[in-house]
């Protein structure tokens, strides 16, 4: 009698990044899947650059879920998670397409999840142009700094050697138990369509009693972030539109408040951090740094 394979659904939302998406899938094709039944679900949100055709041509086993261009990050991820749950996955590995993977990254995530019941496990994210430098790992809540803050000086050589607990995990590469999805649902795609949805989801899981861990031997190299122009460099009209009208913009004040309200250690800390954030924003707009 053979042991039952652990079913892992890999979920990746994509949009018009064919070259990067294909690079990520090529890297995934080389990982160790011993003892695992792995299926990849790509949610293509209406790409016009031939992404889906390229995937079908080179990776025919990948399941492609089409979108119409309105899904964005959260809804795209959700459609993939829902497909993985219908497939009856034991775990969902939600990730971005701009990733290159160590061949043991998934085995190490699974091993840590099995050793730590009721855990959500993130990979050690590293920059692909500075392969030793940690990227967006270990966020901590600091009320007097305006909310979540990411340590900037961590490297692959300075992080703990064993899995370590964190307050938040970004969605670049995170292993989520199917049990957690059944218990807590999926990302809040209505309020956080394209920014902060992963942070709010992790806060919800944590409040439900799931421990957030990072497995430091699960290496994933990511593309460095690109940022929009800072608010103080924009015209007054554009600033007002972003802050008060464009509720899909991550800098929208309503979204910023809701994020803190739902992910802070307490409601008082949420309000205080939001006020600090607004003060910092005002000072930057006035030319102070």
Residue ranges: model-predicted function:
Residues 8-24, 31, 43:
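A conserved hydrophobic helix/loop-capping motif in glycosyltransferases and polysaccharide synthases
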Residues 27, 44-53:
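A conserved acidic beta->alpha catalytic loop
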Residues 27-37:
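Short, acidic, metal-binding catalytic loop of nucleotide-sugar glycosyltransferases
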Residues 67-87:
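Glycine-rich, basic loop-to-helix element that forms the pyrophosphate-binding segment
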Residues 89-100:
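Short beta-strand-to-loop acidic/aromatic patch adjacent to the donor-nucleotide binding site
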Residues 103-142:
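Conserved donor NDP-sugar-binding/catalytic core segment of glycosyltransferases
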Residues 168-169, 173-176, 180-185, 191-218:
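A short, conserved alpha-helix in the catalytic core of glycosyltransferases
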Residues 228, 232-289:
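Non-catalytic, C-terminal membrane-associated alpha-helical segments of glycosyltransferases
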